[in-house]
């Protein structure tokens, strides 16, 4: 049973991760040309509005779908199909009401929100355009939480691909159309962000279809054939809220700090000596653009943070603490193996990456990405460690760590952004400090409060060494290739060739180092689809 649960966990994570690869490719197709169409200033407007949207979305969907997934998993483990059905219905109504309230607020008061949250009235059109997404995503997340609680990750993956595909097509089409018509930058940015709303609608329709096709009928039949008497609506709602609200508060802490981060940057930068309002908009746009790449490693880790919830919850219900510890250590180790090389690669190859992907970027862009590449490693580990604590019923502990990290982030902004020699880089430095604090505290909480034995040195040190060697090789190979190909004189094609060569060698070196340092164990490989064949191919013992 324990081995089956661990297999299901990593199989689910693998399905979600495969979808993430497609989603990230589509996302790059969307955001990279989008930034080049509407410019860094326009992308700054887009990003600022998205930050406001993300705050309301986090309040609505960060914790409650996790609670739903956990409660459905527990009900299924205990053989209570009627309780699972009631939990889903309660969750759907609750999420729908929350989504409707926040959507109406954004529709009716876009200018007030733009000024209050990010100190930019020019963002109001973007806020209005993205507002329907809150309601649509709330409803979608109810279906996702229910289906994931049943151990099926495929509909979530397909739904996300549908969402991003529609967003790409609609968003880019509107951005190009408005730009060619000579519309202002705020209007073009609003057209681009409206694609998010249309994509959210497409995802909702797909998840509704999946639920009706695969779950509605069988769930009703299971309930009818069972003698399970579900808990009252009030009791179900209370437990749903009791589990979900602490998780929501924890996630909302970081979303709120992101809003404060955005507001502080936009308040401080224009008044820094030698910058002024126009350059401040450009610098914030560069910072926003770099976050597109900085978020890439976290996107590959998010599937694991989703899949770990029902796996640990089911083990905890059976009081299988050894299994909880095993899943916890595996998830932390695998997240480090994935996140560390990606973060290191972004850091050492920031210059050529920015030059290739974003034409005419501000000179601060590569330096920002170097810092954010380092920060991305801590972000990934914090995502997984938060999910581990939440899945084991320790929902309040991540709130403490995120409050501490957020406070450090604000302090760094206040101290560093206003300094002329640092300015926008202060925000990136603060991000490193913020998530490093969260990771350290979460690891302490896992060891002390979950009563499991985790070998952190074995989980983190081998991939750290492997990533350091890989990063050094990537830096050296790119430098050599750039000289041989005369990158500075030959244009973007030679730049791309040098970058591909560096990345290719880096990947090969990292795979060798993973084997040499035993960053991944044979036990880990057995838990992923085709893992034993891969382990045999890579000589992992």
Q: Regions from the language model: what does each represent?
A:
Residues 111-130, 281, 347-376, 489-490:
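Interfacial segments at transmembrane-helix termini and the short loops linking adjacent helices
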Residues 62-77, 290, 298-319:
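Helix-loop junctions and terminal segments of transmembrane helices
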Residues 35-55, 185-190, 235-243, 266-294, ...:
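Interfacial/gating helices of multi-pass transporter permease domains
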Residues 173-179, 198-229, 432-483, 508-526:
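C-terminal transmembrane helix end/exit motif
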Residues 136-159, 374-404:
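Membrane-interface junctions at transmembrane-helix termini in multi-pass inner-membrane proteins
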Residues 478-541:
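Membrane-proximal transmembrane or re-entrant/amphipathic helices at the cytosolic face
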Residues 1-26, 82, 86, 227-254, ...:
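N-terminal membrane topogenesis motif
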Residues 8-66, 96, 103, 107, ...:
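Signature of the first transmembrane helix
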């Amino acid at each position: 049973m324990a081995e089956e649960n661990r297999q299901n966990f990593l199989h689910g994570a693998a399905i979600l991760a495969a979808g993430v690869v497609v989603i990230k490719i589509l996302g790059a197709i969307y955001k990279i040309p989008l930034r080049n169409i509407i410019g860094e200033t326009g992308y700054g407007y887009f990003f600022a509005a998205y930050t406001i949207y993300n705050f309301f979305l986090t309040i609505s969907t960060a914790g409650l779908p996790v609670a739903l997934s956990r409660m459905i998993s527990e009900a299924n483990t205990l053989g209570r199909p009627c309780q699972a059905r009631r939990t889903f219905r309660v969750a759907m109504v609750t999420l729908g009401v929350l989504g409707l309230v926040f959507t109406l607020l954004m529709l009716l008061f876009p200018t007030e929100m733009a000024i209050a949250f990010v100190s930019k009235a020019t963002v109001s059109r973007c806020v209005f355009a993205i507002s329907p997404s809150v309601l649509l995503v709330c409803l979608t997340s109810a279906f996702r939480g229910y289906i994931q609680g049943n151990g099926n990750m495929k509909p979530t993956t397909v739904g996300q691909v549908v969402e991003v595909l529609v967003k790409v097509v609609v968003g880019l089409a509107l951005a190009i159309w408005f730009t060619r018509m000579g519309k202002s930058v705020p209007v073009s940015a609003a057209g681009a962000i409206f694609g998010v709303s249309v994509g959210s609608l497409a995802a909702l329709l797909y998840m509704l279809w999946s639920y009706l096709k695969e779950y509605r009928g069988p769930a009703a039949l299971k309930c009818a054939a069972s003698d399970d008497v579900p808990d009252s609506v009030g009791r179900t709602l209370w437990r749903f809220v009791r589990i979900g609200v602490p998780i929501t508060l924890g996630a909302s802490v970081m979303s709120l700090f992101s809003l404060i981060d955005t507001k502080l940057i936009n308040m401080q930068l224009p008044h820094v000596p030698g910058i002024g309002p126009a350059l401040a908009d450009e610098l914030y746009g560069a910072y926003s653009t770099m976050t597109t790449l900085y978020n890439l490693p976290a996107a590959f880790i998010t599937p694991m943070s989703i899949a770990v919830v029902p796996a640990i919850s089911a083990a905890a219900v059976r009081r299988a603490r050894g299994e909880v510890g095993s899943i916890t250590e595996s998830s932390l180790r695998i997240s480090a193996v994935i996140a560390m090389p990606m973060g290191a690669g972004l850091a050492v190859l920031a210059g050529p990456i920015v030059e290739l992907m974003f034409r005419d970027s501000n000179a601060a862009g590569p330096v920002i990405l170097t810092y954010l590449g380092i920060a991305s490693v801590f972000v990934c580990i914090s995502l997984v460690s938060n999910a581990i604590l939440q899945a084991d019923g320790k929902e309040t502990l991540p709130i403490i760590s995120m409050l501490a990290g957020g406070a450090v982030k604000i302090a760094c902004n206040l101290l560093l952004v206003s300094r002329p020699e640092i300015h926008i880089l202060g925000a990136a430095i603060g991000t490193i400090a913020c998530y490093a604090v969260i990771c350290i505290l979460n690891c302490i909480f896992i060891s002390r409060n979950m009563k499991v034995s985790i070998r952190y040195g074995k989980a983190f040190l081998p991939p750290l060494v492997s990533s350091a060697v890989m990063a050094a090789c990537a830096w050296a190979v790119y430098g050599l290739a750039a000289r041989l190909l005369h990158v500075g004189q030959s244009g973007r094609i030679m730049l791309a060739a040098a970058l591909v060569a560096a990345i290719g060698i880096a990947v090969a070196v990292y795979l060798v180092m993973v084997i040499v340092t035993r960053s991944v164990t044979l036990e880990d490989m057995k838990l992923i689809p085709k893992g034993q064949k891969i382990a045999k191919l890579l000589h992992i013992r």
